[in-house]
A protein has these predicted regions:
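Mobile cofactor-carrier "swinging-arm" domains
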Residues: 1-115
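Acidic catalytic loop of the alpha/beta-hydrolase fold
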Residues: 302, 326-330
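Conserved HGGG/HGGXW glycine-rich cap/lid loop of the alpha/beta-hydrolase fold
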Residues: 130-172
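Flexible "cap/lid" loop of the alpha/beta hydrolase fold
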Residues: 214, 218, 224-256
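Short beta-strand/loop motif that positions the catalytic acidic residue
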Residues: 315, 321-323, 327
Length: 373
């Protein structure tokens, strides 16, 4: 951006995840003349992966909408302008004319830093991403049927080093699970941490990944600095086994969309591209068997087979549990409140959020992640 007018703040097309290069502005949620607050939903954007509301990173008066609804724009393209009343229309016109997309070198550096990499472990070939930073690293662990792209809204918010990986049976990693499936995934995490010479880390886990993060911390207390668990397995008795079965067996767009919609309180987040990507993943050799094996290891007649509550209560490190009140996969139940008996454990129950708080409550989750040092 070449303009030096600091009284003008641009609203740009956000970048979510490694592969996003453009997005469609579906709808403006604010009007010219509105005073925008930080965190306020200002527009709805759709990519080839997901549709989501965009929250304002800056506060100010919306003076101009540059982008039109229904149009496709490059990442970092100028969509709107915030400026106070003292800024003239002529200054805004000049700013818009001079604005330069910041995709360029800065964006290339980010993409380079977060490009997919691969490492050979005893459990197979593992895909991961890494970004340098200052402080204790954050290690992100996805859930059942997911991959590291589930963290597309969260990987770049912390100034700390960041790692995220595709577990065996998922994403672009090896599909075979050797031996006990949960132990195979646990071993993968342990070997990855060792291979990357990570002496300590903040563990961030979602669903099955929350169970794995907690298990790692329990078994390696000297390596874990904190736990951030999103809709985690392993803390309650119930699990939606019907979802696990249907996800494992879905082989059509209709079946997959119906199933995946259960993940979200706002089902409009599920778009055609998301469904197509999941079906492509499901059709890879070894995936169906891996999911079936994991499903059987985690659940039995709608009951979870692993419960780590007592061990977490005895663990001496900060634990934040974030749960969607509308979670239909691992529903929040009163028994979770037993966790709060430990003074080191904080529980955040979010209204109007389903099983994917990292996508449905981005601001809240990222606020927690930014506090990790």
């Amino acid at each position: 951006m070449s303009s030096e007018n600091t009284a003008i703040i641009p609203i740009v097309m956000p970048k979510w995840g490694l592969s996003m290069t453009e997005g469609t502005l579906n709808e403006w949620l604010v009007e010219v003349g509105d005073t925008i607050e930080v965190g306020q939903a200002i527009m709805d954007v759709e990519t080839d992966k997901i549709a989501s509301m965009v929250e304002a990173p800056d506060a100010g008066l919306l003076r101009r909408k540059v982008a039109e609804e229904g149009e496709l724009y490059d990442v970092k393209a100028l969509l709107g302008v915030l400026a106070d009343d003292l800024v003239s229309e002529e200054e805004i016109d000049a700013y818009i004319e001079q604005f330069e997309s910041t995709v360029g070198d800065e964006e290339e550096e980010v993409e380079e830093a977060l490009r997919s990499q691969y490492i050979e472990l005893s459990t197979g070939t593992i895909r991961y991403v890494h970004r340098d930073g200052e402080g204790t690293p954050l290690l992100f662990i996805h859930g059942f049927g997911g991959d590291l792209d589930n963290w597309l809204f969260n990987l770049e918010v912390s100034a700390n080093p960041v790692y995220a990986l595709d577990l065996p049976g998922h994403g672009q990693s090896t599909k075979a699970l050797n031996g006990d499936p949960i132990e195979c995934l646990s071993q993968t995490i342990s070997e990855f941490v060792s291979a990357k010479n990570i002496s300590q880390c903040h563990l961030v886990g979602h669903s099955m990944g929350g169970l794995l993060a907690a298990k790692f911390a329990i078994e390696n207390p000297s390596l874990a600095v904190s736990l951030t668990l999103l809709s985690p397995a392993g803390l309650t008795s119930k699990i939606n086994e019907d979802y696990l079965v249907k996800f494992s067996e879905a082989d059509s767009r209709k079946a997959m969309k119906t199933t995946v919609s259960l993940l979200f309180a706002d089902q409009s987040l599920v778009n055609r591209s998301m469904v197509d990507d999941l079906l492509k993943y499901k059709r890879l050799d070894g995936v169906e068997e891996a999911l079936h094996t994991l499903r059987e290891a985690m659940s039995n007649n709608g009951q979870q087979t692993i419960n780590l509550v007592e061990q977490l209560q005895n663990l001496v490190l900060p634990i934040t549990v974030i749960w969607g009140q509308q979670d239909q996969i691992v529903p929040f139940t009163p028994e979770v409140e037993d966790l709060s008996l430990g003074t080191h454990i904080r529980i955040e129950l979010l209204p109007d959020v389903g099983h994917m708080p990292q996508m449905e409550a981005v601001d809240k989750v990222n606020e927690v992640l930014k506090q990790l040092s």
